[in-house]
UniProtKB/Swiss-Prot annotation:
It is found in: Cytoplasm. This is Probable tRNA sulfurtransferase. GO terms for cellular component: cytosol. It catalyses: [ThiI sulfur-carrier protein]-S-sulfanyl-L-cysteine + a uridine in tRNA + 2 reduced [2Fe-2S]-[ferredoxin] + ATP + H(+) = [ThiI sulfur-carrier protein]-L-cysteine + a 4-thiouridine in tRNA + 2 oxidized [2Fe-2S]-[ferredoxin] + AMP + diphosphate; [ThiS sulfur-carrier protein]-C-terminal Gly-Gly-AMP + S-sulfanyl-L-cysteinyl-[cysteine desulfurase] + AH2 = [ThiS sulfur-carrier protein]-C-terminal-Gly-aminoethanethioate + L-cysteinyl-[cysteine desulfurase] + A + AMP + 2 H(+). The lineage of its organism: Bacteria, Bacillati, Bacillota, Bacilli, Lactobacillales.
Length: 405
């Protein structure tokens, strides 16, 4: 069936009181950005729902994009017909016949914005329900939890019918929850944490630490490719590449082995906080899960967090690895995350890192290096890339094959 528009329903936005207008405006902007490649599409965000007028665009492709827009609870592809009862009946029947399977139940749900229309909601429900019962053998009416709800909206500019309700991404529109930076490695966890941050409306800039020649160009490309996939939920993302080689080499040379990881993490967090301040961000997200690795014990977190007063947000804190992997698979980042390119978090990992580092010793050993000078050099060398959903940085088949040779 050729649809004329997609009717979008809000989720949490309905509870936002006086701020609801701002949330709806942001959702409208995000939806337009997500659908920018489709010529002729019109997006109109209203108080109770958002309407996407297709004007001939491919409804299936548009709906695939809408599934990734945070703030959308669900949506329905709709057909517009004239305010003529015969046309309404014919379209309603065609919709039901397209979906119907033996034993299916249904109901009609009518809303009437145009109070001048000749039939009220109850009358229209009866007319359409009776017509479908007469023409679809075996179908039954069920008012509570039917298999099919045929929605009919009588508006001023026509009648709109829909027979499907497709689940959206939920959450809040990206941009309504403020701005933060995300410490993005090439692993499984940090992209999932970024997904959860954006789902709560936070606009994220990705901070990635790059340590050539110890980390490869493929590792950098993988991080950018992960960002491109995450950009599908926000339209575009700023990717901030921070050189970290000299800092890691200096730490390895001057800091006791057991504290290498702790001091590296302290410097990473210092740099992330500095980037956040430069970009007027109010927090730092990471992919830490309590107890998962040595740097993610409470003692390690305390020793590392010591370097900044900026909020450190950990969406995955209480999640098991199996739960995180399941989400990564669902958001299409898992296959990239497991590609065998080491990031800077793994290349200088000591054989026996401190799982319970002492805070005072951490402060002491950090003074063995020129923190300010190393940080300034890294910040001066950072590179910013604007990444969009369709950008491609990694030919996976070629690179994986090359890795195996």
């Amino acid at each position: 069936m050729e649809y004329s528009e997609i009717m979008v329903r809000y989720g949490e936005l309905s509870t936002k009181g006086k701020n609801k207008k701002d949330f709806i405006k942001q959702l409208g902007q995000n939806t337009r950005k997500a659908l920018h490649q489709f010529d002729g599409i019109e997006v109109k965000a209203q108080h109770d729902r958002l309407h996407v007028t297709l004007n001939g665009a491919d409804s299936t492709a548009v709906m695939d994009r809408l599934k990734g827009v945070f703030g959308i609870e669900n949506f329905s592809p709709s057909v517009k017909v004239e305010k003529d009862i015969a046309a309404i009946k014919a379209t309603a029947l065609a919709m039901v016949q397209e979906i119907f399977t033996p034993g299916m139940t249904f109901k009609i749900n009518t809303r009437r914005q145009d109070k001048q229309f000749e039939y009220d909601t109850n009358h229209l429900n009866d007319l359409l329900g009776g017509y479908i019962l007469e023409n679809v053998p075996g179908i039954q009416v069920k008012m509570k939890q039917p298999d099919l709800t045929l929605r009919v909206e009588v508006r001023l500019n026509g009648v709109f019918l829909s027979g499907q309700t497709i689940q959206g991404a939920g959450g809040l529109p990206v941009g309504t929850g403020g701005k933060a930076v995300m410490m993005l490695s090439g692993g499984i966890d940090s992209p999932v944490a970024a997904y959860y941050g954006m789902r709560r409306g936070v606009k994220l800039d990705m901070v990635h630490f790059f340590s050539p020649p110890y980390t490869s160009e493929q590792a950098l490309a993988k991080a950018k490719e992960l960002t491109a996939r995450l950009a599908g939920y926000s339209g575009s993302i700023q990717f901030i590449q921070v050189p970290f080689t000299k800092i890691q080499e200096t730490i390895k040379e001057k800091v006791p082995e057991g504290y290498l990881m702790t001091i590296q993490r302290r410097l990473m967090l210092r740099l992330a906080a500095a980037v956040a301040e430069r970009r007027h961000a109010k927090g730092i997200f990471n992919g830490e899960s309590l107890g998962q690795v040595a740097s993610q014990t409470l003692e390690s977190m305390a020793a590392i967090n010591d370097v900044t007063s900026m909020p450190i947000l950990r969406p995955l804190l209480s999640m098991d690895k199996t739960e995180i992997i399941k989400v990564a698979e669902n958001i299409d980042t898992y296959d990239l995350s497991i590609l065998p390119y080491e990031d800077c978090c793994t290349i200088f990992t000591p054989p026996a890192p401190k799982t319970h580092p002492d805070l005072e010793k951490s402060r002491k050993y950090e003074k063995y290096i020129d923190v300010d000078g190393l940080m300034q050099e890294a910040l001066d060398g950072m590179i910013i890339t604007d990444i969009h959903p369709d950008d491609n940085y990694l030919n996976q088949n070629e690179d994986v094959f090359a890795e195996l040779l």
